């Protein structure tokens, strides 16, 4: 992970080191017009999944370079390293439930006691590995399910 500094990678690294922060996504708008997401010109929009509001604001106050506009619906007052109080904006990302229904035809090697739970666990692991704003590709689950002993065919 990057060294905590004013770069995008550094800010992300610093935020990821905070307790409770599970993911961070940063959208930069380096242009003179609002971007396709509605972020103001020359702004940085930080999204955090988890973490405490005050911790995130303090971290951003310390790590974001002077003169940078922070976008976001959360507005928190935080002191920077010099003790100056700054208005810090960011947003929390929202967990979105993902549901999967998979039909499996089994073979004689299928473990009737634990097989279904193992499949559920593998699907949950894939979903939990997704990054914020990532796309869910159902077909990426198939190789994992087919690798389970006793699975003959998979469909949805």
Where are these regions (language model features)?
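Carbohydrate-recognition loop of C-type lectin domains
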Residues: 2-134
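Short loop/turn elements at secondary-structure junctions
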Residues: 20-21, 134-156
């Amino acid at each position: 992970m990057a060294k905590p500094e004013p770069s995008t990678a550094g800010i992300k690294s610093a935020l990821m080191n905070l307790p409770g922060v599970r993911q961070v996504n940063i959208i930069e708008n380096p242009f003179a017009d609002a971007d396709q997401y509605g972020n103001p010109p020359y702004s940085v929009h930080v999204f955090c999944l988890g973490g405490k509001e005050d911790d995130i604001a303090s971290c951003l106050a310390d790590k974001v370079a002077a003169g940078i506009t922070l976008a976001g619906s959360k507005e928190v007052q935080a002191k920077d390293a010099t003790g100056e109080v700054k208005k810090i904006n960011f947003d929390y990302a929202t967990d979105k439930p993902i549901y999967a229904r998979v039909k499996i035809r089994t073979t004689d090697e299928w473990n009737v006691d634990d097989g279904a739970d193992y499949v559920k666990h593998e699907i949950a692991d894939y979903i939990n590995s997704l990054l914020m704003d990532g796309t869910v590709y159902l077909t990426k689950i198939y190789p994992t399910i087919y690798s389970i002993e006793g699975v003959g065919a998979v469909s949805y």
